[in-house]
Amino acid sequence: MCSIETPHFVIQNGRVQPRFPGGISNELADHIAAELVPLGLVRDISAFERIFVDTVLAARPDPMQAWTAFYGNTMRRLRRPERGGTGAVATFARIYAHALSLVRGATVLDVGCCFGFLPLLAAEQDPRLRVIGTDLVPATAALASRISRVHGGRARFAAADLLALPVADEAVDTVLAVHVLEHLPAGASTRALAQLRRVARYRVVIAVPLEESPDPVFGHLQAFDLPRLAGVGGFPPTPGWSRAVCAADGGWLVLDRGAPDALPDRVGTRCPN
């Protein structure tokens, strides 16, 4: 009987058994990548998602209790991230904080929101905001909706395709797409950006990881550096829009619809406020 032990998993006869006595949060993604990928147990996003979900569900006998605990652990760490931390939760806490600092207006749409941590944080931190999160996977959007109701129901969630958003033109003040574009084929970036600009009244905020090559384990289909991200934003910028590109825990593309206080068109290392 072959058995391999890592800090958070026991692999026996090809079966992965998790061990997280301190509780499971979204740091699980780091542990899968660091401990199981080198063993050849996770070769693509399908295997990653299967192990991720199975690990979360193994923590409690009731599935909803398991997901509620997962959300609770993650949200607590996002609210009080480890200073200077490099793990998934600490890194995304900084990314989410920066994204929220760029919000203009009173309505926010977060596309490709996955578990919906960013919309939940936005609704929690600013009661004045009307926040909607969308994800391509209906089950993920439904799970986020159930968790939102536990948190007062201020953030709303729906299933939607980024390439065909069921949202009227200029219907929301700020549109966020945080770590979404890298999951699209390169040829779809222009279509995605057209949808984001269409529904945004004031601003579009896009964040991507900066990579030399796409990481298939996380489902990445294209890789970005700052020049390529700037190219997605258009050069020269789309008429009526200004553009800023910068780096801060990844790459950022901020597009403002033409206005007296719109961002100047620029590409650099310092991110706008």
Question: What is each of the regions a protein language model found here?
Answer:
Residues M1-A164, T190-L193, Q222, L226-G231:
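Conserved N-terminal segment of class I S-adenosyl-L-methionine
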Residues M1-A29, L163, L184-N273:
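S-adenosyl-L-methionine-dependent methyltransferase catalytic module, highlighting the catalytic core
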Residues V180:
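Hydrophobic adenine-recognition pocket in adenosine-nucleotide-binding enzymes
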Residues A106, D173, Y202:
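Conserved acidic residues
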Residues V108, A171, C271-N273:
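Intrinsically disordered, low-complexity peptide-like regions
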Residues L176:
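A conserved beta-strand element that flanks and buttresses the S-adenosyl-L-methionine
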